[in-house]
Amino acid sequence: MKVEFMQGNQACAKGAIKAGCRFFAGYPITPSTEIAEAMARELPKVGGYYIQMEDEIGSIAAVIGASWGGLKAMTATSGPGFSLMQENIGFAYMTETPCVVVDIQRGGPSTGQPTMASQGDMMQCRWGSHGDYEVIALAPSSVQEMYDFTIMAFNYAEKYRIPVFVMADEIVGHMREKVILHDNIEIINRKKPEEKPCKKPYPFDKLIPEMPVFGEGYNVHITGLTHDERGYPDVSPETHDKLVRRIVNKIRKNKDEIIKWEGENLDAEIVFVCYGSPSRTVKHAVRNLREKGLDVGYIRLITVYPFPDDLLKKLKAKKVVVPEMNLGQIYYEVERVCKKAEEVILVDKIGGELHRPEELERAVLG
C-alpha cells in the first residue's frame, strides 16, 4: 500500500490503469485534459495504447472498437464532448460494449465555463441517447474516490457489459488530496464464451452473455440494429422485445447489487439527499444544524444511477433537501420518489462555485 498526494484527474488515471485499462482514446477538453495527459504518459509503460482522436465522436468510437478487440478501454471528456458522444454511447448500449466514460463536468450550456464546476450533465448521462436502456453512473466527491470509483466503474462495465459513467466535476478533478493506493483490490474481467466459433454470441436465455472478441477464433458480428442471438439484424417485434428487455433487465434485476450509498440518521425529520462535490458541504451543514438542536440526516448517492427508489421511499422525513450545482436535475428524481415528504427543497447553485454550509442551513431554517 502506498499513499500519494495527487490531483483528482491524476487519481482517475491511476485507478484506470490499476483496473486493467490498456486503451484510452480522447480529445483534449478542459477540465478533463490531465486524465488524457496522464494516460498518454503511463499507458505505454504497461503495454497499453493512447490515441488522440480528431474529436469526441471518434474517441468513443475508438473505445468501442478497442473493447471489442479485447482491451479494457476508456475515454474522458467534459460537457461539450459528452454531448458529441451520445450517439455512439447508444451504440455501445445496443452492442453491450463494456467501457468507461469519465465526465469532468463544467458549466454549460454550449462552451459555457470551461474552468468552472457544474453538475449539469446528470440528466444527459441518463437520457442522452434514444431508446430504452439502463445506466450505471458514479459520483465521486473526493480525490480518493476518483481513484476508487474509476476501478469500480471498470468492474461494473466488465461484469454487466455496459458503458459506465464516472460523473465528476471540475472541483474534484482539480483538487489535490492524499490517496491510498491499495494493493488488494478486486478486479473483474469480462467472461468469454467457451465455445468457438460461438454460434450464439447474444443468447436470449442469458441475462448477461459472455463476450466474444475479435481475433480469438470467435464468430463475431456486431450491429446497432436490433439483432438475433447470432448478432445478425432482425427487426421483428419479437426479437426486439427479447433483446431490449434483456439489456434493460440485466441492470434492473441486479440493482440491489449495483446501488451504493452512504448516510446517517435516515429516520430524521430533515434529510439531505446529495451526490458529488456538494456532499462535502452537506456534512458540514448537517453537523451545524445538529448543534442547533435539529433532527437532521443525509444520504449521499455513490451510484446516482440506477436511482435508489426503494431507499428513498423509506424516508420518513418531513423535509427533504437536495443541493445541486445545476438548476435541478436529480432533484426531480427525488421529488418523484419522496411522496411522503411535506417538502422537497431544491438548493440550486450555478456559476461554478460550491455551496457554502450557511446556504444549506438557510434552506432548512427558512
Curated annotation (Swiss-Prot):
UniProt key word Oxidoreductase: yes
Keywords carried by this UniProt record: Oxidoreductase
Catalytic reactions of this protein: 2 oxidized [2Fe-2S]-[ferredoxin] + 2-oxoglutarate + CoA = succinyl-CoA + 2 reduced [2Fe-2S]-[ferredoxin] + CO2 + H(+)
Gene3D superfamilies to which the protein is assigned, alphabetical: 3.40.50.920, 3.40.50.970
Keyword Oxidoreductase belongs to the record: yes
Known EC number: 1.2.7.3
Full protein name: 2-oxoglutarate synthase subunit KorA
Species assigned in the record: Methanocaldococcus jannaschii (strain ATCC 43067 / DSM 2661 / JAL-1 / JCM 10045 / NBRC 100440)
